[in-house]
A protein has these predicted regions:
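Transmembrane-helix signature of polytopic, membrane-embedded enzymes
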Residues: 5-13, 101-124
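Extracytosolic helix-loop segments that constitute the early lumenal/periplasmic catalytic or substrate-binding loops
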Residues: 18-21, 36-60, 67-70, 74, ...
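Transmembrane-lumen/periplasm boundary regions of multi-pass, lipid-linked membrane glycan transferases
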Residues: 38, 43, 171, 180-292, ...
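Short acidic/glycine- and proline-prone juxtamembrane loop motifs at membrane-interface regions
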Residues: 87, 130-140
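Transmembrane-helix motifs of polytopic, lipid-linked glycan transferases
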Residues: 88-109, 147
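Membrane-interface transmembrane helices that cradle and orient dolichyl/undecaprenyl
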Residues: 106-109, 148-164, 284, 333
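Short hydrophobic alpha-helices at membrane interfaces in multi-pass membrane enzymes
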Residues: 113-118, 154-170, 300
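Short periplasmic/luminal acceptor-recognition loop of GT-C membrane glycosyltransferases, typified by
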Residues: 361-476, 486-489
Length: 491
């Protein structure tokens, strides 16, 4: 039964769904990126245009296309605005990537054991698993890239898939801008390498490419028409969009090996097999002209090489090639193992996945792979901030940075934390100028203030991490009455 394709697909889909969505109802959302994207998704349907992603009501950020926020916004409509809803689409796309990895490997190599191992390699170690449990954009991008690549290879057999290839690539661009063009770049190189100009000038392939450009570039066009050069400057000319930044290259040319070092640290136990597999697939591509090897080798090598020149080298940006890594690793191992060894390994893989499902869903174990409680103290604080401030009112900041805990506070309280005040004298001066203002600080900082300025401060709410306070002159305006008051969901 374990070798049955139907069983393996159902087991992988059901198990990954339980792993990615398990223990999410009360886990909370993370700072920085997770809460930042969750706020944008909350505002996408209330902004002036669906094409303009706002943050705390402002359009000064043009860093992200809107498709992930549309999807999460729809989930908010169904489940309400919460941390669970914020991670829901990432989890579902993670499940779909697991399924596509299995299906693509089975389509290429017609072997259930290799396909199951490919999905297993994708899940473990926990890099991909961890991100599928977060409200990030990388898993959404990885899904559209994987779906696009799947349709590209299917297009060799049935050219109707080229249109779907283009649509998925366009959605990848609408998810994470220029990174979404990788399927088109890979597609052109693969089609030329495999079949020459005749394949490139295939009408349906070109129609798919055209569709990807129309869909993907629609956001660029709309925002350029609305905001002009402001959009160009704040999207395309920001530091994180640069390739081969001059200062990095001149000071340390070895920075281009950053991703390789990250893989060496984090991609165990598969790293040696994956490296050997990439070499073997490259050899098969150049010597034997095997189209499957060409396809998978280009899928991993083009993004890896190009992204290695980028300013921001974060391993999650490469999740788009992890399905190909899984297939290459699985096929390489399958060629090294005997059939009896494969039969013995399969129950172990099933057992590890089942154990992970149980750990996530029926134990209180707290580990860094997205099983820790996130910002519980701030979630408890958020209703008190919300009820004691007006919608347009900001919270004064003493002792925190510009960005932490700004994003999480903004998501759970719908209020914005101002830039930090760094010294106590300035705080007291501002408190005298605006006694009705409320402040947030670490508990240690608040205790120092109380000691140095007795009878000046009133603590509205405090816990192990945060002190939310105001001037004693404002005490009579503070309320703890939540009757008939709709407060933000703090899950």
């Amino acid at each position: 039964m374990l070798s049955s394709k139907t069983f393996q697909i159902l087991f992988l889909v059901y198990s990954s769904l339980l792993i990615f969505l398990g223990r999410q109802l009360d886990r909370g959302i993370t700072n920085f990126d997770g809460a930042y994207y969750a706020i944008k998704a909350r505002e996408i349907f209330s902004s002036d245009s669906l094409w303009v992603a706002t943050w705390m009501g402002t359009t000064r950020f043009f860093d992200n296309p809107p498709l992930p926020f549309w999807l999460t916004g729809v989930v908010y409509k169904v489940f309400g605005v919460s941390g669970y809803a914020a991670v829901f689409s990432s989890a579902i796309f993670g499940v779909l990537i697991v399924y596509l990895t299995y299906s693509l490997c089975n389509y290429l190599y017609k072997d259930n054991w290799t396909s199951f191992l490919a999905a297993f390699v994708l899940l473990f170690p926990g890099l991909f698993l961890d991100s599928s449990r977060r409200a990030m954009l990388d898993i959404t991008l990885a899904f559209f890239v994987t779906a696009s690549m799947y349709c590209l290879i299917k297009g060799l057999e049935n050219r109707k898939f080229y249109l779907l290839y283009g649509l998925m690539a366009g959605c990848a661009v609408l998810t994470k801008s220029l990174l979404g063009f990788f399927p088109i770049v890979i597609g052109f190189v693969f089609m030329f390498w495999y079949g020459g100009l005749r394949n490139i000038f295939d009408f349906r392939f070109l129609a798919g490419v055209a569709l990807s450009i129309i869909v993907g570039c629609s956001w660029y066009l709309v925002n350029w028409m609305m905001f002009g050069d402001l959009f160009i400057d704040r999207h395309f000319k920001t530091p994180h969009m640069q390739l081969i930044p001059g200062e990095n290259f001149s000071n340390n040319t070895l920075y281009i090996f950053g991703y390789l070092k990250d893989m060496l640290r984090n991609y165990w136990p598969w790293f040696p097999v994956t490296v050997a597999g990439v070499f073997l697939f490259a050899k098969s591509s150049f010597k034997e002209k095997d189209y499957r090897s060409m396809f998978l080798f280009l899928w991993v090598s083009i993004p890896f090489v190009i992204m290695s020149t980028s300013r921001n080298q974060t391993l999650r940006y490469l999740f788009m090639i992890f399905p190909a890594f899984g297939i290459i690793t699985a096929h390489t191992l399958a060629g090294w193992l005997k059939d009896t060894q494969k039969e013995r390994a399969l129950p172990w893989m099933v057992g590890i996945i089942m154990t992970t499902v149980l750990v996530v869903n029926v134990t209180p174990i707290q580990v860094k792979v997205s099983l820790e409680q996130n910002n519980a103290e701030l979630r408890n604080l958020a209703p008190f901030v919300h009820i004691n401030t007006k919608p347009s009112e900001t919270i004064f900041n003493y002792g925190y940075t510009n960005w932490n805990p700004t994003q999480v506070l903004g998501f759970y309280s719908e209020r914005l934390l101002e830039g930090p005040v760094k010294d106590a004298e300035t705080l007291i001066q501002k408190l005298e100028e605006n006694p009705e203002g409320t402040w947030l600080s670490p508990v240690s900082k608040f205790k120092e203030l109380e000691k140095n300025f007795p009878e000046e401060l009133y603590l509205i709410y405090g816990n192990q991490k945060f002190a939310y306070f105001t001037s004693k002159k404002n005490r009579e305006n503070i309320t703890y009455n939540f009757f008939n008051t709709k407060v933000p969901i703090v899950r």
